[in-house]
UniProtKB/Swiss-Prot annotation:
The keyword Transcription does not apply. Pfam families: Ribosomal_L7Ae. GO terms for cellular component: ribonucleoprotein complex; ribosome. SUPFAM superfamilies: L30e-like (SSF55315). InterPro entries: Ribosomal_eL30-like_sf, Ribosomal_eL8/eL30/eS12/Gad45, Ribosomal_eS12, Ribosomal_eS12_CS. The keyword Cytoplasm does not apply. Belongs to the eukaryotic ribosomal protein eS12 family. PANTHER family: 40S RIBOSOMAL PROTEIN S12 (PTHR11843). GO terms for biological process: translation. It comes from the Eukaryota. Keywords: Ribonucleoprotein, Ribosomal protein. This is Small ribosomal subunit protein eS12. One of its GO terms (molecular function) is structural constituent of ribosome.
Length: 143
C-alpha cells in the first residue's frame, strides 16, 4: 500500500513586476509587451528581418537601440518606419534590447547572462492585451 506523494509544483521565474497601484514606466511596459509578443511568435529581430517585415506592412511597432554604432542602419530603419507609418520607440542600450528579445541565456537564479546585443526589433503581433500594451500605445499616440 505505497502511496505516491504529489510532485512539488515549481512556479516559473518571471521578471519583477511592479506593485499594483504603482504606475508602470515605459521601459517596463515595453519589456512586458516584448515578452508577450515573443510568446505569440510576433517578434522580429535584426535589420534584415525587420526591414522585410516593415516593407510587407506587417509591423506594428519598431524598437531601435540608441547606442547603435552604424549611422546607415539607424537612417534606414527611421526612413522605413516613416515611409510605412510604423511607430518607432528608442531604448538606450542594445544589450537591454537583446535581453528583452530573449537573445541570452538564463541561469538557475533567473538572471540573464551571455546577453547578445540587438539594435532593432519589430513587433508584428502584440499577443494578448495587457497594461503594458496600453501604456506603450498611449506613448506612441502622444508622439
Amino acid at each position: 500500500m505505497a502511496e505516491e506523494a504529489p510532485a512539488p509544483v515549481v512556479a516559473p521565474v518571471e521578471a519583477p513586476t511592479p506593485i499594483l497601484g504603482e504606475p508602470m514606466d515605459l521601459m517596463t511596459a515595453l519589456q512586458l509587451v516584448m515578452k508577450k509578443s515573443s510568446a505569440h511568435d510576433g517578434l522580429v529581430k535584426g535589420l534584415r528581418e525587420a526591414a522585410k517585415s516593415i516593407e510587407k506592412h506587417a509591423a506594428q511597432l519598431c524598437v531601435l537601440a540608441e547606442d547603435c554604432d552604424q549611422p546607415d542602419y539607424v537612417k534606414l530603419v527611421k526612413a522605413l518606419c516613416a515611409e510605412h507609418n510604423v511607430h518607432l520607440v528608442t531604448v538606450p542600450s542594445a544589450k537591454t534590447l537583446g535581453e528583452w528579445a530573449g537573445l541570452c541565456k538564463i541561469d538557475t537564479e533567473g538572471k540573464a547572462r551571455k546577453v547578445v546585443g540587438c539594435s532593432c526589433i519589430v513587433v508584428k503581433d502584440y499577443g494578448e492585451e495587457s497594461e503594458g500594451l496600453n501604456i506603450v500605445q498611449q506613448y506612441v499616440k502622444s508622439q
